[in-house]
Amino acid sequence: MSVATGSSETAGGASGGGARVFFQSPRGGAGGSPGSSSGSGSSREDSAPVATAAAAGQVQQQQQRRHQQGKVTVKYDRKELRKRLVLEEWIVEQLGQLYGCEEEEMPEVEIDIDDLLDADSDEERASKLQEALVDCYKPTEEFIKELLSRIRGMRKLSPPQKKSV
């Protein structure tokens, strides 16, 4: 068995190492000894192009996988996801203060950000929030005003609906 090394900057950068090692059987017969090939060291030279072709194929597969994984971040931008997460954490914190309890003890309150973003006006959004917070005994006006301010400029994360023609 001969050893061929091949390196590529993309392969090395992806795995964190420099050169990659590939094991390739010699071409000159099934279990031959090193002396059975026509020239000394020729099996290593013959297998090197095969190993680099295999390395190129693996690099191409890794790039395709990265491209497929990248589709998720194209559909849902990481920056938008982070903004959404920060907003949701802020909402949970504010609801805890409004209801005067921990998250586990909080009554079931559903605030759908995408639903709010679908609303045509701030008045409609405020109305939906007031309906969701009807059981809250503390004043909710400040929370509603701040939430409406925070969602301004955000985009919906739900997949777009197909329009019927």
UniProtKB/Swiss-Prot annotation:
Record's bilayer topology term? Peripheral membrane protein
Residues modified to Omega-N-methylarginine? 27
Give the Gene Ontology MF terms in alphabetical order. protein serine/threonine phosphatase inhibitor activity
| Compositionally skewed regions (Low complexity) per UniProt | 1-12, 35-63
Compartment annotation = Cytoplasm; Membrane
Record keywords: Phosphoprotein included?
Answer: yes
Tissue expression summary: Detected in breast cancer.
Question: Phosphothreonine-modified residues are where?
Answer: 73
Disulfide bond positions: none
Query: Which residues are annotated as modified residue Phosphoserine in the UniProt record?
Result: 25, 33
Give the UniProt keywords, A-Z.
Acetylation, Cytoplasm, Membrane, Methylation, Phosphoprotein, Protein phosphatase inhibitor
Q: Where is this region: Disordered?
A: 1-73
InterPro entries per the UniProt record, alphabetical: CPI-17, CPI-17_sf
Q: Name one Pfam family in it.
A: PP1_inhibitor
Q: Does the keyword Membrane apply?
A: yes
Q: What does this protein do?
A: Inhibitor of the PP1 regulatory subunit PPP1CA.
Put simply, this protein is called Protein phosphatase 1 regulatory subunit 14C
Name the gene for this chain: PPP1R14C
